[in-house]
Design a protein with these regions (language model features):
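Active-site metal-binding loops of divalent metal-dependent hydrolases
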Residues: 55, 205-207, 233
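Short beta-strand-loop/turn "lid" adjacent to the catalytic site in phosphate-handling enzymes
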Residues: 1-12, 16
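Conserved small/polar residues in nucleotide/adenosyl-binding loops
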Residues: 264-266
Length: 266
């Protein structure tokens, strides 16, 4: 993408000046590796990941090397971060609105005003795809009709959590079906064998830094056999640490320098 060309040009200049190699990674690889920085147990095995931000809301399948990232689902229209920012701005909050919107939502959850309101935003999920445009429309109309900002803010996070929970369950179901089918094609079919299915989910991107969203999602999936992995909020929203870690690992792989990841300052 053009927005990343400035950084690439700077890297090439530094490389030429210092005589060091340049390693190229995607923006998405950086976010995934940054989130995995606090979840080293995921490295070396396949897992799912949600990349949630203002520019991306994708469900990904990641291979053990982090080099093969396949998009298997996600939004069909606006992103989760766009939903948060647009409604936050509609409430008079500054862009980006995530942190302020979460504060308003937290207060509504604490004083029970959201629970008492009965207001709920719809969650639209089909297989591994979701939609947030209808949610934005209903929430915007509710604000125009005088619904309390805290109620709408809490409803937004509740909607995103319900949407992600449905996608997690659908992904597990599909993965289990695929694992069973593969087992049948290799050896005697063993109905119900789920040992080969992937059930670990890593959450990356700015939206994933929300404490409320994490708590809501964990609550909705606490009875589901799944591992949810979150990183420190600062690692959710910044992929620079991920790029640094990937470069250090590439250096070690090429036998140049064995760098300790502890040298990466967060």
């Amino acid at each position: 993408m053009p927005v990343f060309l400035a950084g690439k040009s700077h890297a090439l200049s530094v490389s030429a000046a210092l005589g060091v190699p340049v390693y190229e990674f995607t923006h998405q690889q950086g976010h995934i590796r940054a989130a995995a920085f606090d979840n080293e147990s995921l490295l070396g095995k396949d897992f799912f990941a949600f990349h949630l931000s203002g520019g991306t809301s994708e469900l990904l399948r990641i291979d053990s090397s982090l080099s093969d990232i396949k998009k298997i689902g996600g939004t069909t229209d606006i992103n989760a971060g766009q939903l948060v920012d647009r409604l936050g701005v509609a409430m008079g909050l500054r862009f980006p609105a995530g942190k302020e919107l979460e504060k308003i939502a937290a207060e509504a959850l604490k004083n029970k005003s959201y629970a008492d309101s009965g207001f709920v935003l719809p969650s639209s999920v089909k297989n591994l795809s979701c939609s947030f445009s209808g949610v934005e429309t209903k929430a915007a109309n509710a604000l125009k009709s005088g619904e309390k900002h805290g109620t709408v803010a809490a409803a937004v996070y509740d909607c995103i959590a319900r949407t992600l929970a449905k996608l997690v369950k659908n992904a597990i179901e599909l993965e289990t079906e695929n694992a069973a089918r593969d087992a049948c094609s290799i050896s005697k079919c063993s109905i119900g064998d789920e040992t080969a299915s992937t059930k670990s989910f890593l959450f990356a991107g700015g939206v994933a830094s929300s404490t409320i969203l994490r708590e809501m999602l964990a609550d909705r999936l606490h009875k589901t056999p799944v591992e949810l992995h979150f990183s420190r909020p600062v690692l959710s929203s910044d992929n620079a640490v991920g790029i640094a870690a990937l470069a250090a690992e590439e250096e070690a792989f090429n036998g140049r320098t064995a760098m300790s990841l502890s040298l990466i300052h967060i």
